[in-house]
Amino acid sequence: MAKDICAATGERIRELRWAKGWRQIDLAEHSGVHEVHISDLGRGTREPGLRTLNKIVSALGTTLSEMLRGL
């Protein structure tokens, strides 16, 4: 995944998280994804895997296609 796509994906995750009023730890608890991993994704420094993205979008109450729309 290109670095700009990683950054855009992380930004989108952050936007969706903020819309719920969640901190990184809240998303970590709801998704089962470690807080450090959430932080790395938010900064665009870690490439998200499909399994991780599915856990995150499920916790955020959205779909993968909706989250990635426009990226």
Model-flagged regions — what are they?
Residues 1-8:
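A detector for short, charged/polar N-terminal pre-domain segments
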Residues 32-47:
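Recognition helix of helix-turn-helix/homeodomain-like DNA-binding domains
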Residues 51-66:
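DNA major-groove recognition helix of helix-turn-helix/homeodomain DNA-binding modules
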Residues 2, 58, 68-71:
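Short, charged recognition helix plus adjacent turn
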Residues 16, 41, 67-70:
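Amphipathic alpha-helical segments that mediate coupling or scaffolding at interfaces
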Residues 11-30, 55:
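Short basic helix-loop element that most often maps to the first helix and adjoining turn
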